[in-house]
Curated annotation (Swiss-Prot):
Organism the protein comes from: Synanceia horrida (Estuarine stonefish)
GO molecular function: potassium channel regulator activity; toxin activity
Protein name: Stonustoxin subunit alpha
GO BP term, example: killing of cells of another organism
Record note on domains: The first domain (residues 2-265) is structurally homologous to the membrane attack complex-ferforin/cholesterol-dependent cytolysin (MACPF/CDC) pore-forming domain. It makes numerous contacts with the FAT domain and comprise essentially the core pore-forming machinery. The second domain is structurally homologous to the focal adhesion-targeting (FAT) domain (266-385). It makes numerous in cis contacts with the MACPF/CDC domain (first domain) and the thioredoxin (THX) domain (third domain) as well as extensive in trans interactions at the SNTX-alpha/beta interface.
Post-translational modification: Intrachain disulfide bonds may be present in the heterodimer. Not glycosylated.
Tissue: Expressed by the venom gland.
UniProt cross-references to Gene3D superfamilies, sorted A to Z: 2.60.120.920
Superkingdom of the organism of origin: Eukaryota
Summary of the function given for this chain in its UniProt record: This lethal (towards mammals) heterodimer induces hemolytic activities due to its ability to form pores in the cell membrane. The pore may be composed of 10 SNTX-alpha/beta heterodimers. The toxin elicits potent hypotension which is endothelium-dependent and appears to be mediated by the nitric oxide pathway and activation of potassium channels. In addition, it displays edema-inducing activities, increases vascular permeability. It also shows myotoxic activities and interferes irreversibly with neuromuscular function.
């Protein structure tokens, strides 16, 4: 009959004789129109065994509906929230979280038996019920095809736009192999190296009408599960479920019954599909923006996106609810299709239109991209992200650093006028909104090439100095977002001993190493050091948390054997390998060599190959109370003049990138340059000390 309906079961518990309201897509369980005796007499069953698999490469609603054999009208009912699906049909609710994510789905379908009620209308007596008398049903189930569906949904990690198509193609090729992959006796999946590499980055989600002992979550799990599906359906389809149903108009069996007056125009259905698909796509874009690591670190932008998500989700639910309310009325002939068109038109003319929301998300994504281009420069350095002014104050005031340098994103706004418009529109009837404000991007800071370039230049300068001050105990570097209308894009704040000194800090130009006169200028680069117990010679003792060393020629220390230990000379390295710019001070007394060395310096040679200053691995300033100060490298020695012979505090300044290590006599807040070695360093250097060489006494304290 032309008014018969054919539809997928979608995990709903259809039985022969069950009543159905096609206006509301609602099953009416607990009652059979024909009764058990009549059903028994006129029911026929025919085996209809088949199986197939199919690849679904798209995540669109249209592709999913096609995979589930859903016609346009039922599809709109599902999107509008009228149909509650179960079993394998829950696949319809599984959408990608991100736009930049590849998804490929393997569908397995098996059919087992076809059952039908064979008595024509008018030849059997039907049971009366208040359901039919009150017009609560329009159709009755007359045939059911049983079987089972299974969907293996494989998702890649979030990828860059440029890699999306390539990953998608490789995923399709790999997923197509699942039905043909063999599992050896060890139950391991045999894959090529390339397939293993791809599979390791895929996640799997299973939606099916099969009862599994455990759900597959990986590609390998999916392969193993797929192999078992034919047996899980049971002998003679014992475990199969309704897959497809045929429904006859109830009026054919009961003249008092209501009927479906009209189905919705296909073009109208497509417009509703498009509208709801657009909403889901916009939602995914917001999800993707929210998941950016940098967004999680910056509450100003995180809260803005979160606020949008809440408003937009409420709006989506409102649209779905309106569609769900109108569909039954249109199908019953109570309202015209124009009521559905009005939902589409209202959205197109509202602040929630696809054009306006897309424009706002474009601006958010641009803003995030600019922030990432700056923040990415300091990723992996010691610069610390703080979430707000309170946390920054805590770090600056309570922290141990004397100098705090802060890269501030100044133009990330807390209040967004467009979000206020969205909120007002959703909460109030459209007629009460005086005007519709579209999101503005023309004058937004992140679209200004000049502003962005200045931000990136400032970020690069900040990054360079973060690297220069690596391991400095007196300087801290921080990143955050604080609104400040005085500066577009970004600025650098400087705090000195807990107080804000300037909101527009410029790093001072460094003098030549000979030009340093004030100790405070070098203390910016001060770092903490400790002696390395694995390198210390057995004739040196350690104390004060490994910061004080003394020669012990009359008492051998019982250090454990270690390949890094110096054997032939009274020497020790520090634990810290240094690159960048660093300053440290020592108090020395007696016979001492102070400098730097590569970790690769020999340890056990009895000649001078392992002695500091006698090879290409080390650079030292030596103090001998009898003859004074000597700089030594590669066995070459030169006397060094000191302004006050016998001074007790020595400062060392390393500029690794510039290739220099400088020595200073320290007195109060003044330093006097003694000597600078110039070279090209090829690996990290370690503070190095020789304490009491050749049987002499010496002590040294790290400050």
């Amino acid at each position: 009959m032309s008014s018969d309906l054919v539809m997928p079961a979608l995990g709903r518990p259809f039985t022969l004789g069950m009543l159905y309201d096609a206006r509301r897509e609602k099953l009416i369980p607990g009652f059979s129109l024909f009764g058990d005796e009549t059903l028994q007499k006129y029911q026929s069953s025919n085996a209809q065994r088949s199986s197939e698999f199919k690849i679904v490469a798209s995540d669109s609603t249209e592709s999913k509906s096609s995979a589930m054999d859903i016609e346009a009208s039922l599809g709109v009912s599902f999107l509008g929230g009228l149909v509650e699906v179960g079993g394998s049909a829950k696949y319809l609710n599984n959408t990608k979280k991100y736009q930049n994510q590849s998804r490929v789905t393997l569908k397995y379908k098996a059919t087992t038996v076809y059952k039908q009620f064979t008595a024509p209308p008018g030849t059997v007596t039907v049971q009366e019920t208040a359901i039919t008398e009150k017009g609560l049903a329009t159709h009755v189930v007359t045939s059911i095809l049983y079987g089972a569906n299974a969907f293996f949904v494989s998702d890649s990690d979030k990828v860059e736009d440029t890699n999306l198509q390539d990953i998608q193609g490789k995923m399709e090729a790999a997923i197509k192999k699942i039905p043909t992959i063999s599992i050896e006796g060890s139950a391991s999946v045999q894959l090529t190296d390339e397939e293993k590499s791809l599979a390791s980055n895929l996640s799997c989600k299973f939606h099916g009408d099969f009862l599994l002992e455990s759900l597959p979550t990986t590609f390998e799990d999916a392969v193993k599960t797929y192999q078992t599906l034919p047996t899980l359906i049971g002998e003679d389809g014992a475990n199969s479920v309704p897959m497809k149903v045929w429904l006859a108009p109830l009026k054919s069996y009961n003249s008092k019954a209501q009927q479906l007056i009209q189905e919705i125009n296909v073009s109208k259905v497509r417009r509703i599909h498009t509208t709801l698909e657009e909403l889901h796509k916009l939602k995914r874009r917001a999800n993707e923006a929210m998941d950016v690591k940098l967004v999680q670190r910056i509450p100003l932008i995180h809260d803005k996106i979160s606020n949008f998500q809440q408003i937009f989700q409420d709006y989506m639910l409102t649209v779905q609810k309106k569609i769900a309310e109108k569909l039954p009325l249109v199908r019953a002939g109570t309202e015209s299709e124009q009521s559905l068109q009005k939902i589409i038109d209202d959205r197109a003319q509202s602040p929630f239109s696809n054009e306006k929301v897309s424009k706002w998300l474009d601006a958010v994504e641009r803003e995030i991209a600019v922030l990432k281009s700056c923040a990415g420069m300091v990723e992996g350095t010691q610069a610390k992200f703080v979430s707000n002014q309170t946390e920054l104050d805590r770090e600056v005031l309570v922290g141990k650093v004397k100098h705090a340098v802060c890269f501030i994103f100044t133009s990330v706004e807390r209040n967004d006028p467009y979000l206020k418009v969205l909120s007002d529109y959703w909460e109030s009837p459209p007629s009460n909104n005086a005007k519709d404000v579209a999101p503005s991007t023309e004058d937004k800071w992140c679209f200004s090439t000049e502003v962005v370039l200045k931000m990136q230049q400032r970020a690069q300068t900040f990054c360079d100095h973060v690297n220069d001050f690596e391991k400095s105990r007196n300087v801290g570097f921080f990143i955050t977002a604080l609104e400040n209308g005085k500066f577009q894009g970004a600025s650098i704040y400087y705090y000195k001993e807990g107080s804000l000194a300037t909101q527009d800090f410029t790093f001072p130009r460094m003098p030549f190493v000979q030009g340093y006169k004030k100790r405070s200028d070098l203390l910016w680069y001060a770092c903490d050091l400790t002696f390395d117990r694995n390198t210390i010679n057995n004739w040196i003792s350690l104390s004060d948390n490994d910061t004080f060393a003394a020669s012990e020629h009359g008492k051998r220390q019982n250090y454990p054997k270690h390949p890094e230990r110096f054997v032939s000379f009274n020497q020790v390295l520090c634990n810290e390998g240094l690159m960048g710019k660093h300053y440290w001070e020592v108090e020395w007394n007696g016979y001492i060599d102070v400098g730097i060395a590569y970790i690769s310096i020999p340890r056990k040679e009895i000649d001078f190959a392992s002695a500091f200053g006698y090879n290409t691995y080390s650079w030292v300033l030596s103090y001998n109370p009898k003859i004074g100060y000597i700089e030594r490298h590669k066995k070459r020695e030169y006397n060094v003049r000191a302004p006050n012979p016998g001074f007790k505090r020595l400062g060392l300044f390393l500029d690794w990138r510039y290739g220099s290590i400088s020595f200073y006599a320290v007195s109060s807040d003044e330093v006097h340059h003694l000597h600078t070695f110039k070279t090209k360093f090829t690996e990290p250097v370690y503070p190095a000390f020789s304490i009491g060489p050749a049987g002499n006494h010496g002590t040294l304290r790290l400050l």
